[in-house]
Amino acid sequence: MGPVALPTWLQPRYRKNAYLFIYYLIQFCGHSWIFTNMTVRFFSFGKDSMVDTFYAIGLVMQLCQSISLLELLHIYVGIESNHLLPRILQLTERIIVLFMVITSQEEVQEKYVVCVLFIFRNLLDMVRYTYSMLSVIGISYAVLTWFSQTLWMPIYPLCVLAEAFTIYQSLPYFESFGTYSTKLPFDLSFYFPYVLKIYLMMLFVGMYFTYNHLYSERRDILRVFPNKKKM
């Protein structure tokens, strides 16, 4: 008897693609809900909706961002083809700003810049996860491919600027309340605002590195895509 072929649903490649599709779908639904909620609230309540943006969508934003840490595992085990370091930089800046800066300071949560930051982030993620979700099942559209590989070019630097402004606005509150700052037994202390100021400078260094990586990735994808269409 010859070797017995496994059913399609048991084949490793099928299971990997099915898992990635479900993951991308969950992320797409989460970010779409956030973006739609923010849009509807803005047109319904105007600027007043921007003040309590975090209270309305913060929990879902935190959930989506926490789940996105799985992407590091995807790259590490090889089920997602991408470079690990750029993704670490992207996720690190998001985690720090969302959880350590915005979530820890209620006064910062009411700033307009938080609403702007969330709009930029979710717009990028909606398009990115749509493209990834369709790509993993072999569906590709030239317009969507171009859009997903181009939208980040103006939006990503704006995201970083919004993150930097959020950190800058949070500094007086960290200085006043002493959040995360600790007095040590000897003549030294851990003063968190200093850490934020250093990180604020490093943020733009990371942006330069990530931007170059994304641009190289865009160039490679758009170069290969016309050849796929011809085949």
Swiss-Prot record:
GO terms for biological process: fatty acid elongation; sphingolipid biosynthetic process; very long-chain fatty acid biosynthetic process. It is found in: Endoplasmic reticulum membrane. Residues 41-56, 134-135, 179-189 are lumenal. Pathway: Lipid metabolism; fatty acid biosynthesis. Coiled coil: none annotated. Keywords: Endoplasmic reticulum, Fatty acid biosynthesis, Fatty acid metabolism, Lipid biosynthesis, Lipid metabolism, Lyase, Membrane, Transmembrane, Transmembrane helix. Residues 1-19, 78-112, 157, 211-231 are cytoplasmic. It catalyses: a very-long-chain (3R)-3-hydroxyacyl-CoA = a very-long-chain (2E)-enoyl-CoA + H2O; (3R)-hydroxyhexadecanoyl-CoA = (2E)-hexadecenoyl-CoA + H2O. It is a multi-pass membrane protein. Its main location: endoplasmic reticulum. InterPro entries: Tyr_Pase-like_PTPLA. Catalyzes the third of the four reactions of the long-chain fatty acids elongation cycle. This endoplasmic reticulum-bound enzymatic process, allows the addition of two carbons to the chain of long- and very long-chain fatty acids/VLCFAs per cycle. This enzyme catalyzes the dehydration of the 3-hydroxyacyl-CoA intermediate into trans-2,3-enoyl-CoA, within each cycle of fatty acid elongation. Thereby, it participates in the production of VLCFAs of different chain lengths that are involved in multiple biological processes as precursors of membrane lipids and lipid mediators. This is Very-long-chain (3R)-3-hydroxyacyl-CoA dehydratase 4. It comes from Bos taurus. The gene is HACD4.
